[in-house]
Design a protein with these regions (language model features):
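Extended basic (Lys/Arg/His-rich) segments that typically form rRNA-contacting surfaces
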Residues: 1-205
């Protein structure tokens, strides 16, 4: 499975050939550097590790610097391993948007926006206990009863409650590639991609 590491640039709108307005996401992807090639004989499985984004050497560990020097490249901010990569590659090779085609469908994995600690209304879409009347107050966003008193006399595991929201790994499938600009390393896909501007993303072919 081929892929690339990139980051989210932002959103825009484009018209298709039929005049429909499409909400699109702009992604910057590549060029990625092959930082390691894993083989069945040496590592037990076949995979290619790609690196993306420049990191200053003073901010990298000695182990990381040595790892990237083997590939004759500078330290990278982000690395990712792609198993069963379609192309035959070796350390130091560069991979760009040429592996994708306009009109094809891709899968994107990224990190969703972190919302912090949120209540049940925002986190799970609860409607609240009800109107703030009949003697009630400050109950319009409350979760309500958590469980029965006699039966089951406990709170079930997995009950939806308040807690930390967002900041999760999210995979979005079947995003259509609308446009590719190889010179600027930009790709435009139809639809939304989780995360804020600058979020690192993994593109799967």
């Amino acid at each position: 499975m081929s892929g690339l590491i990139g980051k989210k640039v932002g959103m825009t709108s484009l018209y298709d050939t039929e005049g429909n307005l499409l909400g699109c996401t702009v992604l910057e992807a590549g060029p990625n550097v092959v930082t390691q090639v894993k083989t069945v004989e040496k590592d037990g499985y076949k995979a290619v590790q790609l690196g993306y984004g420049e990191r200053r050497e003073k901010n990298a560990t000695a182990a990381a610097i040595g790892h990237f020097k083997k590939a004759s490249t500078t330290p990278k901010v982000k690395t990712h391993e792609f198993k069963e990569f379609e192309e035959e590659l070796k350390q130091g090779d560069k991979v760009d948007l040429g592996i994708f085609e306009e009109g094809s469908y891709i899968t994107v994995t990224s990190t969703s926006k972190g919302k912090g600690f949120q209540g049940v209304v925002k986190r799970h879409g609860f409607s609240g206990v009800g109107e703030s009347t009949h003697g009630q107050h400050d109950r319009s966003r409350a979760p309500g009863s958590l469980g029965g008193s006699s039966t089951p006399s406990r709170v079930f595991k997995g009950l939806r409650m308040a807690g930390r929201t967002g900041g999760n790994k999210v995979t979005t499938e079947n995003l259509r590639v609308v446009k590719i600009d190889k010179e600027k390393n930009l790709m435009v896909v139809e639809g939304s991609v989780p995360g804020s501007k600058g979020t690192y993303v993994i593109l799967w072919k």
